[in-house]
C-alpha cells in the first residue's frame, strides 16, 4: 500500500498550516527536527526526526551512515529511517546495503535523469525496507508512485503547499486501491441449518448499491456479501453495514489478508468492493454479534467449490453476475453469484502456498 510523509518547512506558522492540511488529507507521518511536542498538540502524529523524542529515528540527513549505525539505532526499539542523497555509484551501493537493515530508506536525488531512480529501486527487489523518495512537488510524487514500472513504496513531500498536499492525498487513495478478479459462481446448494452467532460489521463509510464485503467459510473462495444499502418493507437501509455471516467466517482485509469476523473490532480495517472488484479500505466502527437463523450457501466455479453461511433473512443479499443484489431468501440452485477465488491457503490470515482441504 502506497503512503506519504510530509516535511514542512519555514516558520512555525507555515509549518502548522501544512501539518493541519496533512492531517486533513490523511497523512499523519511528519518529518520535523524541532517541534515534536508542539506538533503532537495538533493531533495524533508520528514524528520522524534525529531527536530522542522522535517516533521514528532519522539517520543520514547531514552525514553518511553505515549498516552498523542503523543496527545501533534499532537497539532503542524504534523504527529507523535512513536518508541517502544519491550523487554517484557509491551512494547507489550504500542504498543497496542499507535497504537490507533499515525500516525505511529515503532517497534524495539531485538529478534522476542522470541516475535513474527506477534502476535503483529495481536493484532493491530483495530489500526488507520501505523505499521512500524525497520529492519537492506533486508532479514528482506522481512520477515516483505511479508512472514508473518499479515505483517507490512511498514519498516524502517537502512542501508547505496545501494544494499539493491535498492533491497528493487524492493520488495516494487512487494508487492504493486494490482490485479483485470476481467470478460468477453457480449456486449448488441453499439450505437452512439452524441457529448460530452472526456478525454485523458497521463501518465508518457509506456504501453504494452493489458494494459489499468478501466473506466465506473457505480460504479458497469468498462471496461478495452485499451491504444493507437497499430499503425494505421491514427495515430502513443501513448503507454503512454488511450483515456478513457467522463468527468463524473469513472477511477480506487490506493487502489480500483475511481476518475472522469474530476478531474484528472498532478501529480495524476491512475491504469493501463493488461488483467490478474495485476495492476501498474502510474503518470498522462497530461489530455486533447476535444469535440468528443461518442459511448455508454452496457455489461452484470450474473445479472449485466454496461455502458460506449467512443470516436467513430477506434483507441479506449476495450479488449476481449482472452486478445486482439478490436476496438469499430468493436464491436457488443454478443462480450465478459473484465470488473471489484463490488457490492459496491461509495462515494467520496471510495467503501461503500450501495444500489444504476445506469442506
UniProtKB/Swiss-Prot annotation:
One of its GO terms (biological process) is aromatic amino acid family biosynthetic process. Keywords: Amino-acid biosynthesis, Aromatic amino acid biosynthesis, NAD, Oxidoreductase. It catalyses: 2-amino-2,3,7-trideoxy-D-lyxo-hept-6-ulosonate + NAD(+) + H2O = 3-dehydroquinate + NH4(+) + NADH + H(+). GO terms for molecular function: 3-dehydroquinate synthase activity; dehydroquinate synthase activity; NAD binding. It comes from the Archaea. InterPro entries: DHQ_synth. Its EC number is 1.4.1.24. Catalyzes the oxidative deamination and cyclization of 2-amino-3,7-dideoxy-D-threo-hept-6-ulosonic acid (ADH) to yield 3-dehydroquinate (DHQ), which is fed into the canonical shikimic pathway of aromatic amino acid biosynthesis. Belongs to the archaeal-type DHQ synthase family. This is 3-dehydroquinate synthase.
